[in-house]
């Protein structure tokens, strides 16, 4: 929760600074955001190697590896259903937002970066904001409703609801509600989704 509040604070601070032109030179540096994203992806790879997760992964069954794929697939299906109700933007834009799978910090910037050329800065900013808020709400729901998910749907459902956050913010809640045995599955889901999310977003943003 603290991490989410920090992200919101910095996001609002950025809006205020940009609107009032408080730091003019930042507009010249906007194009460098994509390189920051590349660095973030490299750090994910470093974390994977540093924590030596390979032995843990080898002990898991096929279901554990399929979970992140079902998580992403289910997210995209329900995102498409939301599009049928709302129709505010094209379907592929909705799918780009849903394809973030809870990765709000990356998705908001990535969507803005890839949509501003085709849709304009205004629409790109709107989509980035929606991605930030909707995926942040997903994380909050996972944190607050964890006991309900665990009790009525099982611990796979709880891990799936967390999306990418199953590897960090929601992990303590998963352990508390599901026990230590759920940790390897949660970590594998987080790692696989961290790899899938940038690819999924770029795919739908290019349509």
Regions found by a protein language model. Name each.
Residues 2-6, 33-34, 58-70, 93-100, ...:
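Cytoplasmic-side transmembrane-helix entry/capping segments in multi-pass membrane proteins
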Residues 37-41, 142-146, 158, 170, ...:
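Alpha-helical transmembrane segments and their lipid-water interface positions
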Residues 1-56, 69-85, 204-207:
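Structural signature of multi-pass alpha-helical membrane transport proteins
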């Amino acid at each position: 929760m603290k991490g989410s509040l920090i992200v919101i604070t910095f996001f609002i601070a950025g809006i205020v600074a940009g609107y009032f032109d408080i730091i003019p030179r930042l507009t010249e540096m906007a194009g460098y955001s994509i390189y920051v994203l590349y660095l973030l992806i490299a750090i994910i790879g470093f974390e994977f190697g540093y924590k030596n997760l390979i032995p843990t992964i080898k002990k898991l069954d096929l279901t554990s590896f399929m979970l992140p794929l079902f998580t992403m697939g289910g997210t995209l299906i329900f995102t498409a259903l939301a599009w049928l109700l709302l129709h505010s933007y094209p379907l592929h834009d909705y799918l780009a937002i849903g394809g973030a799978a809870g990765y709000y910090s990356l998705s908001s910037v990535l969507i803005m970066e890839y949509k501003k050329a085709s849709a304009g800065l205004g629409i790109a900013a709107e989509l980035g904001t929606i991605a930030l808020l909707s995926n942040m709400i997903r994380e909050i729901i996972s944190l607050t409703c964890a006991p309900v998910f665990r009790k009525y749907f099982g611990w796979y459902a709880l891990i799936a609801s967390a999306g990418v956050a199953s590897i960090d913010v929601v992990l303590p809640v998963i352990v508390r509600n599901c026990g230590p045995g759920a940790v390897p599955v949660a970590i594998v889901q987080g790692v696989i989704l961290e790899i899938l999310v940038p690819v999924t977003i770029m795919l739908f943003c290019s349509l």
